């Protein structure tokens, strides 16, 4: 809505990047629809970031380090399956093989990583989400990732010991606030 757009406009003036708000009239549907709302504004590589995730900014550099596959994307993943900041019942799980994603979803088995919510993408992600909607009725971002994974166009990279938190509960909000204070203290 308007208050969020004003906040983003204010923030954009303080950052060395361009931020464009894309209105998603289908916000109540799958999160892939929010990605598709940005399609008219994108003609090159772009990030998809989860708004409720706090993450070490270095993860952006990690995910951009290698060239993107043509028409593909890359997801920063956490291989630390014992990460205490992860809500195992809610996290999106990832099955990787080398630097490729094989499968993704909240309910998959055989996973060996967690989705951090930090993506580096080509416009091929838009096509993959559209294909997922058309072929499977799945309008989630994960549906698009599965389409790219099936075509071996969905890469991944490990974040190592970098911090990320999906802020979905009051306890995780407290943890995120503590992490921000700690980071600010270290920066000073």
Predicted ranges, named:
Residues 1-47, 186:
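Conserved N-terminal catalytic core of the sugar/cofactor nucleotidyltransferase
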Residues 18-20, 100, 153-155:
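Conserved beta-strand segments of alpha/beta enzyme cores
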Residues 44-45, 71, 152:
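Short coil/turn segments at beta-strand junctions that form active-site/ligand-binding loops
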Residues 97, 110-188:
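Conserved alpha/beta core of the MobA/IspD/sugar-nucleotide pyrophosphorylase nucleotidyltransferase superfamily
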